[in-house]
Amino acid sequence: MDKFRVQGPTTLQGEVTISGAKNAALPILFAALLAEEPVEIQNVPKLKDVDTSMKLLSQLGAKVERNGSVHIDASQVNVFCAPYDLVKTMRASIWALGPLVARFGQGQVSLPGGCTIGARPVDLHITGLEQLGATIKLEEGYVKASVEGRLKGAHIVMDKVSVGATVTIMCAATLAEGTTIIENAAREPEIVDTANFLVTLGAKIAGQGTDRITIEGVERLGGGVYRVLPDRIETGTFLVAAAISRGKILCRNAQPDTLDAVLAKLRDAGADIEVGEDWISLDMHGKRPKAVNVRTAPHPAFPTDMQAQFTLLNLVAQGTGFITETVFENRFMHVPELSRMGARAEIESNTVICHGVETLSGAQVMATDLRASASLVLAGCIAEGTTIVDRIYHIDRGYERIEDKLRALGANIERVKGE
């Protein structure tokens, strides 16, 4: 397995170009199964999960090509089962189910894999499809969905806010007969992006970005060209990298209005932040950040995917900061690893209490999930001495060429090929 070797401390400064959002690209790739004509998807990040999704679409009979953009022609899809060997590495595969049953009347997906953070069941996807009229069976480790004729529009009230299930229901409802209303829908920018992609193909969707999405079913979806929005979590990660190293950064190809909660906390930490239409700059003017209190919650509140990075910020900040995680359980696996580097923190149920220290020292640490591992790499950039981050396949699932981008900012980081 590959590792990163990072030499610190360094001050990170310069420019970085933000990639397309993984969490929008994946649902959009699967939503392309609904289209009867070719689609072109631009600004798709080059990531392991994206490659897996493209492979899965090919196995279903879609023509998939990548030359800068991703081109998908799903007109000849003739296989309706997403097999275990691909699904086991990536839980996003569940998003194949809604489009398959909506367009072809049948679909089956092996139960998914992915990061191991707490309970992320597929129940909400299943109950949503059932409310649209699908029959669901769980057999031999597969979720099997079928419907006679078309799905039927329904008024669906989600038990809890779920990005994944909102995507599934919204995609399936585009081809259902009649109108579907999703109450307590997720409001994430990636949901809005997926909805806008579907609208490009001819879907009728209103209310995306609010907690009530209305979908008027149409008979078919055509083709189109669509550009995936910038990755707000990658943007936030690089902003934190500059903040903790007392540096300055310009993020290009960014979308500032998707990061309001994060930018507010960075300003509280003492960062000087400016934004333009598609850029964000941060300058610490050489100062150490101040500790901030953060509580994660569904969008538009502070994103759980930025929690590990802000935990690190607090651990090297002036003062004491509290970080409360309300979205996923078991999401503080980076804290013991950071403690090995000299961080001072206590975990009390779903809150981590961070006591800022002046410096961290390099150590051998292990990545446990995608965002936690990014925080370990950033810690290595500012720690005294050498840090080895093991199991970085987690990082490759969500960050495009993170080491190249960090190197361009002055980090001393190299990928060490594993056995």
Swiss-Prot record:
Task: Name the positions where UDP-N-acetyl-alpha-D-glucosamine binds.
Answer: R91, R120, P121, V122, D123, L124, K160, V161, S162, V163, D305, V327
Transmembrane ranges, per UniProt, are none
Active site per the UniProt annotation? C115 (proton donor)
Q: Which residues form the signal peptide?
A: none
User: Where is it mainly found?
Assistant: cytoplasm
Q: Where in the cell is it found?
A: Cytoplasm
> Which residues does the record give as phosphoenolpyruvate binding sites?
K22, N23
Q: Which residues carry this modification: 2-(S-cysteinyl)pyruvic acid O-phosphothioketal?
A: C115
The pathway this protein participates in, as annotated, is: Cell wall biogenesis; peptidoglycan biosynthesis
Q: What is its EC number?
A: 2.5.1.7
Family statement? Belongs to the EPSP synthase family. MurA subfamily.
Q: What is this protein called?
A: UDP-N-acetylglucosamine 1-carboxyvinyltransferase
What organism is recorded for this protein?
Salmonella schwarzengrund (strain CVM19633)
Q: What is the lineage of its organism?
A: Bacteria, Pseudomonadati, Pseudomonadota, Gammaproteobacteria, Enterobacterales
Give the encoding gene's name.
Answer: murA
